[in-house]
């Protein structure tokens, strides 16, 4: 395997499947089965999950909610997704722990960096919920932060598109996909991959990001093996 320790970022929207809201159990089980295959080969894997399938703080703020309050609601939505992922993973035979940045001891462990690393060393998947515990920060930024904290080799951003494009491929059929690019290219070009804080964190800590299509069967395993899928972002192309 090309990577020993991986941080997998899943958007909340990815868990919806073809639905317009909520969680598609079939998608959760498909992700769990792919993760199980990777973990069985010895890769240590942590997950950060978003909450946009249930609530998105920016939309709440745009509708008149206080931004910080809306972000806290979004953080709670990520915990719902994290617990759902834990259930799917454990049904797939993967021992899993949920750690949350907002303490809720009845359903999850509090986020403790050293404990998270110990879980990974024991072959458990750790799902991080609750964002980073502070408003005004995205779950993409949380993914970069947790990756740096647990000394991950790479961040996988598994999404609905098969990589990074020079413009929106849904609106522009002639959009060009990048096989590889630098963090500086992403920041300078304002490419819609992750927010600038998330990109800068990975840049400063020299953690590459691989963006790929979550819904292509086996892609998580291919990415862990270092196969050339999606787009790779790093300090040097």
UniProtKB/Swiss-Prot annotation:
Binding-site positions, ATP: 9-12, 52, 56, 159, 165, 168
Location of this chain's protein in the cell = Cytoplasm
Q: How is its activity regulated?
A: Inhibited by UTP.
**What reaction does this enzyme carry out catalytically?**
UMP + ATP = UDP + ADP
Pfam families recorded = AA_kinase
State the UniProt keywords alphabetically.
Answer: ATP-binding, Cytoplasm, Kinase, Nucleotide-binding, Pyrimidine biosynthesis, Transferase
User: Pathway membership of this protein?
Assistant: Pyrimidine metabolism; CTP biosynthesis via de novo pathway; UDP from UMP (UMPK route): step 1/1
Main location, first listed in the record: cytoplasm
Record GO terms (molecular function): ATP binding; UMP kinase activity
Q: Where does UMP bind?
A: 51, 71, 132-139
Keyword check for Transferase: yes
Q: Which GO terms describe its biological process?
A: 'de novo' CTP biosynthetic process; UDP biosynthetic process
Q: What transmembrane ranges does the database entry give? A: none
The UniProt entry, under SUPFAM superfamilies, shows: Carbamate kinase-like
Q: What EC number(s) does this enzyme carry?
A: 2.7.4.22
Annotated Gene Ontology cellular component terms: cytoplasm
Q: How does it assemble?
A: Homohexamer.
Q: Give the family, as the similarity comment puts it.
A: Belongs to the UMP kinase family.
Q: What does this protein do?
A: Catalyzes the reversible phosphorylation of UMP to UDP.
Q: What is this protein called?
A: Uridylate kinase
């Amino acid at each position: 395997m090309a990577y020993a320790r991986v941080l997998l970022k899943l958007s909340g929207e990815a868990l919806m499947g073809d639905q317009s809201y909520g969680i598609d159990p079939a998608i959760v089980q498909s992700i769990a089965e792919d993760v199980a295959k990777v973990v069985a080969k010895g890769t240590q894997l942590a997950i950060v999950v978003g909450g946009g399938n249930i609530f998105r703080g920016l939309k709440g703020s745009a509708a008149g909610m206080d931004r910080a309050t809306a972000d806290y609601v979004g953080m709670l939505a990520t915990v719902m997704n994290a617990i759902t992922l834990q259930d799917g993973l454990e049904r797939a035979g993967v021992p899993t722990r949920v750690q949350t940045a907002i303490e809720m001891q009845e359903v999850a462990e509090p986020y403790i960096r050293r404990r998270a690393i110990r879980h990974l060393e024991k072959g458990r998947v750790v799902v991080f919920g609750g964002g980073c515990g502070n408003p005004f920060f995205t779950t993409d930024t949380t993914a970069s932060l947790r990756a740096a904290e647990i000394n991950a080799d790479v961040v996988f951003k598994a999404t609905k598109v098969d990589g990074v494009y020079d413009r929106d491929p849904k609106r522009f059929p002639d959009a060009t996909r990048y096989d590889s690019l630098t963090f500086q290219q992403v920041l300078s070009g304002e490419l819609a991959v992750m927010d600038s804080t998330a990109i800068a964190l990975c840049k400063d800590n020299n953690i590459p990001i691989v963006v790929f299509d979550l819904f292509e069967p086996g892609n998580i395993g291919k990415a862990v093996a270092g196969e050339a899928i999606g787009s790779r972002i790093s300090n040097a192309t």
